[in-house]
Amino acid sequence: MSHGPSPRLAESPQLSKGSLLTILGSPSPERMGPADSLPPTPPSGTPSPGPPPALPLPPAPALLADGDWESREELRLRELEEARARAAQMEKTMRRWSDCTANWREKWSKVRAERNRAREEVRQLRQRLDALTKELAGARRERQEAQGECEARGRELARLRGARGVADQTRDGPEPEAEREPVRDVGSERPPGSQELELVESLLKSMPEESEDCWEARSLGAGGPRGSSGRQERSRLPWEDTAATEEEASKLTALRLRLDESQKVLLKEREDKLALSRNIEKLEGELSQWKIKYEELSKTKQEMLKQLSILKEAHQDELGRMSEDLEDELGARSSMDRKMAELRGEMERLQAENAAEWGRRERLETEKLGLERENKKLRAQVGDLEEALARRRRQTASALDCDLRASQAALFEKNKELADLKHVHGKLKKQFQEKVAELAHANRRVEQHEAEVKKLRLRVEELKKELAQAEDELDEAHNQARKLQRSLDEQTEQSENLQVQLEHLQSRLRRQQQNAPLFGKIRSARFGTEEAEDGTSDLDEDEDLQIQVA
């Protein structure tokens, strides 16, 4: 619907007198009614000297419309300034929100970097622990190998001693003779091989002297009063002497063979003894090396325990810092919740203001409709005035000019008022459009704020989930550290048990080394008593000396 003026009213100020007369000359019968309300004119053709009749004035709301519109414009401008201030405040709050989110991101990046650092340290500790466990396993294997070698050496020693005892028993079995006296440890400073050789040589030297003494004693005992019997015996003596010399020669050859065998056995036993001494020295060197390695392992273990304690302290410090950061974040989260509540209140207030703006808009529309109705009334009044002027022009030709001028002036004023009203209406329309655009912009901003608030809520939930994951990972790291500590304690206990076993083996080896000469002495004493009871020869002393050497 167009609200512009009608062309008849728009062109009314430019109408000439003739046109007005023609218009007034042909009045319509429908508009003749209101002429009765006009004052009567004089019957003569001359106009009355009095003032022209008063024209009907517009209603009071039309006169007071300008003041109302100015006050309304001031109110609208004030509301516009308030809306702009609110929009600036909202922008400031959104900037603060963006700064808060940036700070949160920085804090979470720091927390993630610290978490990655802690994971890297835990991984390095695991690698070091694996390397230490491998070294401990290698040390255990080497220790077990050393124990196996020690046991094998012990078995070899026992086997050699058993073989030597069996050889001694086999040597002692076929000989019927026994020693006269048990051999004692005389001249222990000399080597046992030289003592045995000297004993065998003395035995060989004493045997021919004894045979010569026996021969002289026999020859002296034969010279008696019985000469005939002596002569008979002299014929027997060469045969007996030859038999005795043959027996003694066979005994000497047997003794020499036994001497050679005993020398060979002594050489073999010396070589075995040297090899055993070398093996024992080698084992002692290996034991010293194992002791050094064990000390190094204990030192490395102490260092690892120190490092673990340092890492535990650092981890506890980091946990304290992380708990403080979490408390700060909880405080920031509570402040963010408060800000969210404030923003919600502000959004509700903006929604209420938006509703009020919509109410104002409806009121403006109603006022606009009222103005349009007033315009229609004014147009109707203008039409009535024109009809009244036409009737008066028809009634009084003399007062036509005055009435025409007055009506033209009134029409001009009315047109002027209508133009002012149109101008004000255009301004109000522009302001209304601006308000509508601002309201649409405010609605878009509110929707953007709501979307950003939703994004922030989602981000807060994601941060909560990441925080829970970080706490779970920290708990897993604690559990793994406890497991590693438990495994380290078990390994230390196993290493202590192995050390105790190694000390027991060393003490057993020392006892065996100390008991070896005592065992030889006991053997020699036992064999000496048995030979003294049997009355054996000096050849068994050689065997006792061999047993003592063993």
From Swiss-Prot:
Acidic residues compositional bias, start-end: 530-550
Residue numbers spanned by region Disordered: 1-69, 138-247, 472-497, 509-550
GO CC term, one of those recorded: myosin complex
Compositionally biased residues, Basic and acidic residues: 138-159, 169-188
Keyword Coiled coil carried by entry: yes
Phosphoserine PTM positions: S12, S26, S28, S537
InterPro entries per UniProt: Myosin_tail
SUPFAM superfamilies hit by this protein: Myosin rod fragments
Disulfide bonds: none
Coiled coil: 72-161, 263-396, 427-518
Sequence ranges of Pro residues compositional bias: 37-61
Gene3D superfamilies recorded: 1.20.5.340, 6.10.250.2420
Alphabetically ordered keywords of this record: Coiled coil, Phosphoprotein
The keyword Coiled coil appears for this protein: yes
Pfam families the UniProt entry points to: Myosin_tail_1 (PF01576)
Protein name as it appears in the record: Coiled-coil domain-containing protein 102A
Phylogenetic placement of the source organism: Eukaryota, Metazoa, Chordata, Craniata, Vertebrata
